[in-house]
Amino acid sequence: MESRGAADSQDPSAFLSGITGASVTVKLNSGVVYKGELQSIDGYMNIALEKTQEFVNGKLRKSYGDVFVRGNNVLYISAD
């Protein structure tokens, strides 16, 4: 079994707190992707983004100032 380095042992909560204010990609269960600046996230994975772009089937569909995503719709969050 391979051991992990210190960087890999960070818990998800600490990771998400550390990327607040950074550019992120949020993919929803529906396949829609939002790219924007992470403003806040709570224990239910509810997410607030600013300067957000919405992508459907890989194509830019719309740009928003602010977006709120309910946590049960989130498939994953990725730091850009």
Swiss-Prot record:
Compartments, record wording: Cytoplasm; Nucleus
InterPro entries: Lsm6/sSmF (IPR016487), LSM_dom_sf (IPR010920), Sm (IPR047575), Sm_dom_euk/arc (IPR001163)
Domain Sm: 11-80
SUPFAM superfamilies assigned: Sm-like ribonucleoproteins
An example molecular function term from Gene Ontology annotations: RNA binding
Gene3D superfamilies: 2.30.30.100
Record's keyword annotation contains Cell inner membrane: no
Highest taxon of the lineage: Eukaryota
GO biological process: maturation of SSU-rRNA; mRNA splicing, via spliceosome; tRNA processing
Keyword line: Cytoplasm, mRNA processing, mRNA splicing, Nucleus, Ribonucleoprotein, RNA-binding, rRNA processing, Spliceosome, tRNA processing
Any Pfam family: LSM
A GO cellular component entry from the record: P-body
Family statement drawn from the similarity comment of this UniProt entry: Belongs to the snRNP Sm proteins family. SmF/LSm6 subfamily.
Role, per record: Component of LSm protein complexes, which are involved in RNA processing and may function in a chaperone-like manner, facilitating the efficient association of RNA processing factors with their substrates. Component of the cytoplasmic LSM1-LSM7 complex, which is thought to be involved in mRNA degradation by activating the decapping step in the 5'-to-3' mRNA decay pathway. Component of the nuclear LSM2-LSM8 complex, which is involved in splicing of nuclear mRNAs.
Subunit and partners: Component of the heptameric LSM1-LSM7 complex, which consists of LSM1, LSM2, LSM3, LSM4, LSM5, LSM6 and LSM7. Component of the heptameric LSM2-LSM8 complex, which consists of LSM2, LSM3, LSM4, LSM5, LSM6, LSM7 and LSM8. The LSm subunits form a seven-membered ring structure with a doughnut shape.
Protein name: U6 snRNA-associated Sm-like protein LSm6
Gene label: LSM6
